[in-house]
Amino acid sequence: MNTIYSKHHFLVSVIVGLLLGISVTDSALLIFVTALYAGIIGVIIDIDHFAISRLHSGDWSAAKNCLRFPVQSLIYQEDIFGEEEVEPAERVLSHLLISGVVVPVIWVFTPRWSFVTGVVLYVHILTNAYADASGYFD
């Protein structure tokens, strides 16, 4: 299975955040905050992979190992999950379900950040689909 890792999602999300920030403000601080927020959202959505892995493996070993060895988890991401613990279709479905809840909830409090969140999550799902289809990020 081809995959895209956190470093790729972070970079793509920061670029999206920069473009969104630049398009609506001249404030360097707000552009920076938007890019940072986008980077965080673009990576944090993948926390659902641990729940999917738990469903397949029957335990939380992937999450426990990442908490025990966080630096290794960032460097050797390909070793976090066992083979076929996180299937592409499940990952995409989970991301769509989370996005469909998170974006409207944020909209209630702040439409601007809801828009940023929605765009970043959309791009996240697109990059996953592209990586799954092409193997470009391997």
Question: What are these language model-derived features?
Answer:
Residues 1-138:
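N-terminal membrane-targeting hydrophobic helices
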